A protein has these predicted regions:
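Positively charged n-region of N-terminal signal peptides that target proteins for export
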Residues: 1-3
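Sec-dependent signal peptide hydrophobic core
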Residues: 5-9
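C-terminal motif of bacterial Sec signal peptides marking the signal peptidase cleavage site
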Residues: 14-16
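Bacterial signal peptide processing site
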Residues: 18-20
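Short aromatic-glycine motifs in intrinsically disordered, low-complexity regions
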Residues: 25-37
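A general boundary/transition motif marking the beginning of the first structured unit of a protein
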Residues: 32, 70-74, 145, 149
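Surface-exposed amphipathic alpha-helical segments
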Residues: 35-45, 90, 136-167
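Conserved polar/disulfide-associated segments of primarily extracytoplasmic proteins
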Residues: 46-137, 142
């Protein structure tokens, strides 16, 4: 399981760039955008992936969190299309629950799935929101049966989200 779950983090990665990215006081700043996220609890290891703005991983359990903003080249697709993009690479996808929610005063789509990656069962919680010409996506991946253990950290990240600026 340990060798498969880091792949999950990589597959969830939406296009991004770490050059010129700064994360201080829960605010991520990169070219053209700055946004705030909530704080995750102790135990998460922040990992630097060139394809994500922010990512955390718990090696002992295989839980993963990811946040990314895309402000160029996304052609303004609907929220459900953005969720499907995040599901690429996963097979046997089963939608558990999907709901429209409001995040930072914008409509967002929150989707809970069970799926497999390379035959390994996982649970996913995905959230996409569009604001000020940017797409923000949040992902939580948990081993099947361990979803509830760390879902509060995903909720904290999203609850603390605020788009600070775009240019």
């Amino acid at each position: 399981m340990r060798h498969v779950l880091p792949i999950i983090v990589l597959l969830l990665a939406a296009p991004g760039c770490h050059r010129g990215v700064r994360f201080e006081n829960q605010v991520l700043t990169k070219s053209g955008v700055s946004y705030r996220v909530g704080e995750v609890s102790p135990g998460w290891e922040r990992v630097m992936l060139s394809s994500n703005d922010l990512a955390w991983f718990i090696e002992d359990t295989g839980h993963a969190l990811q946040v990314n903003a895309t402000c160029k080249g996304h052609d303004d697709p609907p929220l459900d299309v953005l969720v499907r993009h995040l599901l690429m690479g996963f097979t046997e996808r089963q939608l558990v629950e999907e709901q429209k929610v409001v995040v930072d005063e914008r409509d967002a789509l929150r989707s809970h799935y069970r799926a497999k990656l390379d035959g390994v069962p996982v649970e996913l919680l995905l959230l996409v929101v569009k604001k000020d010409n940017c797409v923000y996506d949040f992902s939580y991946v948990a081993p099947l049966g361990r979803f509830e253990e760390r879902v509060a950290d995903f909720e904290a990240l999203v609850h603390g989200f605020h788009a600070e600026r775009t240019s």
